Amino acid sequence: CKVNQYETQAMEQLLVQTVVTGCTMMINRSLARLACRPVGEGDMLMHDWWLALIAAAMGRAVFLDRATIDYRQHGGNVVGAKDPRSAGYVLQKLKGGAVRRSLVDTARQAGAFLSCYRQELTPDQQALLADYAAAPEKGKLARLTLYRRRGLWKHGLNRRIGQILWW
């Protein structure tokens, strides 16, 4: 999907989906210092995602609209970029509750981020993180209301449908 440069800079967007590729990131000393805090095992889903959250919450995340490397995925990549339009991707996500598990993981990451950086966050950011972290415990209507009210939508039709139907 085509990524909107303004959405990539918003904490709301970065809570639900990473759009950052670590090997293309540049960070400054302030961000590096903030990133050196201990985080519980399994609470930080990906280091580049975590760094983007810190930048969006306490500074700025800037989108560069040009390729800086030739990225290709090798057969042995465990994560790597996936194509959400492919049938294989959709089937893999539907099997065994993967969509829900993925969304619950992002909520857990939001709670860990709040715990780690509460003192540096604005009251609105604290409320956003607390609301999103608590989302797995809420009913579907309450979660959808939160997404709509806070703009917590994933990029791409397939991802958004998965977010609506399976969480």
Region annotations inferred by a language model:
Residues 4-82:
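Conserved nucleotide-sugar donor-binding catalytic segment
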Residues 37, 44, 50, 72-167:
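C-terminal subregions of glycosyltransferases and related glycan-biosynthesis enzymes
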